[in-house]
Amino acid sequence: MLLKKHAGKGGGREPRSEDPTPAEQHCARTMPPCAVLAALLSVVAVVSCLYLGVKTNDLQARIAALESAKGAPSIHLLPDTLDHLKTMVQEKVERLLAQKSYEHMAKIRIAREAPSECNCPAGPPGKRGKRGRRGESGPPGQPGPQGPPGPKGDKGEQGDQGPRMVFPKINHGFLSADQQLIKRRLIKGDQGQAGPPGPPGPPGPRGPPGDTGKDGPRGMPGVPGEPGKPGEQGLMGPLGPPGQKGSIGAPGIPGMNGQKGEPGLPGAVGQNGIPGPKGEPGEQGEKGDAGENGPKGDTGEKGDPGSSAAGIKGEPGESGRPGQKGEPGLPGLPGLPGIKGEPGFIGPQGEPGLPGLPGTKGERGEAGPPGRGERGEPGAPGPKGKQGESGTRGPKGSKGDRGEKGDSGAQGPRGPPGQKGDQGATEIIDYNGNLHEALQRITTLTVTGPPGPPGPQGLQGPKGEQGSPGIPGMDGEQGLKGSKGDMGDPGMTGEKGGIGLPGLPGANGMKGEKGDSGMPGPQGPSIIGPPGPPGPHGPPGPMGPHGLPGPKGTDGPMGPHGPAGPKGERGEKGAMGEPGPRGPYGLPGKDGEPGLDGFPGPRGEKGDLGEKGEKGFRGVKGEKGEPGQPGLDGLDAPCQLGPDGLPMPGCWQK
């Protein structure tokens, strides 16, 4: 395929006359897959390198941020730093000891010399008191004055229709005009009934005020209104007494195993862990073969002058490899005569020779220093001596360090009940609008009186457990050397001791005068003295041949533990612990004494307007009004119309 492509691209070139070999054909067939695989591998390698580089940079940045946030760089403890740290620790320990001793020291209270009366200035006004209880209803008041007259009552309803006329209908045509008198007498009868009421007259003058009517019957109670909106949150009330301990509830039913939750989000990066303990030293490796001697290096340039301060001591270097065993050297030249040796050690004592002739008595030599013999055996104890007189009392010793506070002892028995206190002031304070004076009077009433006499001593509680031993204190300064004590009385003479061991030989005495020559004694055996000390070492011989590596040595014993390091600085405050279990309920407290009656509170604000009540019952009918003005004459008065709009029946017949 590749050959065909090249041939196609060449265009004008002539095709190869020779056929490709089988190796070339195989290469041509396998080249594209190999190239693709190599390209993929190279791309994967580049991507992995980039990914690892990014991750490494990210990790280094996080470590640097954590170190800077923690602010705990490595500290190399130098001698100056150790001394400074030691002084700081000592000062801190002394401060803690002084604080503890001051807290546990008995404190003396001095009696007050202030008078029993209160001379304190008035304090600031307190908070607004709670609303007082509702007072009892007062007695009924006196009857009030007569009220003004009420308004005019409503117009009354129309009266019932009156009866018709009872007179028959008469024809008056038979009477002549001359007989008017007779006509009048015949026609006029008795006074008729009152006609229908006339039209309403003009309004009359205002009448005198009427009496106040009686109160109507009490109306029915109104429908309860809608519940009001919840008010603002009030102040927190006083803490109630602790309730009694509830009974132990029944054990709950064990819950079912919950389903596995979704995996949580990755947590925040944790802090650097505490460095692990130092690992144990590994086994000593086998010795390697000695390398060949390298060529000698060039002479180095002269170094800069170093500082005069002593450098840090380097770690001991590794032991060098053993040199090759040298070949035996040629015999050396005879050495120079050695230095005269020191006199040899004294040889063993020879056998005693034959006794010589007695010499003349020499002069007495000076006494040598007394030799210190070995300690003799202890003698038998002497008889018990009489008891000596009691010595004078020594000075009072310094106060020892106070031990730690022991565990609290068991609660003692309850003491007898105290006497009943005096009754508090119960007078009611009327402040009359002056709040400052009322507060001053309350302060005067509630001032604490002088302290009463101390109560009887309670029963002695049981002895507490022995406290743990206190921390050993710092070594005190060395005291002055005391004066030499008086010499004690000589003891009883002990029994004579046994014969002591022979003492050391005394010092050589002065050389005596030469005695007379004695008779020649027999020749004693000749004793050869010990050999003299070895001569000085000769020069080192040439290096021997390289020896075989020795066997692996056994591990050396573990070195001793180093001294304890100085106390570290106080660590940072740890995280907040989880809340502990709920403690048992406390016993109910005693009922408190009733407080003083508070002064009346201020007048409350005006309440909201109530809802409109239901319509009351109809009132009593009012009194009859004054008579109206007389109406018009009956003949001239127009007929009153009925409900149908026509004149009333009988009116038009007049």
UniProtKB/Swiss-Prot annotation:
GO biological process, one term: axonogenesis involved in innervation
Collagen-like domain residues: 121-164, 192-247, 249-308, 311-370, 372-425, 447-505, 571-630
Bias-annotated ranges (Pro residues): 140-151, 196-208, 528-543
Region (Interaction with amyloid-beta peptide): 181-188
All ranges on the Cytoplasmic side of the membrane: 1-33
Pfam family for this entry, one: Collagen
Record PTM text: Undergoes proteolytic cleavage by furin protease to yield the soluble collagen-like Alzheimer amyloid plaque component. Glycosylated.
Major site of localization recorded for this protein: membrane
Transmembrane domains' residue ranges: 34-54
Subcellular location: Membrane
Entry comment describing in which tissues the protein is expressed: Expressed predominantly in brain. Deposited preferentially in primitive or neuritic amyloid plaques which are typical of Alzheimer disease.
Extracellular side: 55-654
Listed Gly residues bias regions: 494-503
Site (Cleavage) location in chain: R112, E113
Protein name as annotated: Collagen alpha-1(XXV) chain
Organism: Homo sapiens
Lineage: Eukaryota, Metazoa, Chordata, Craniata, Vertebrata
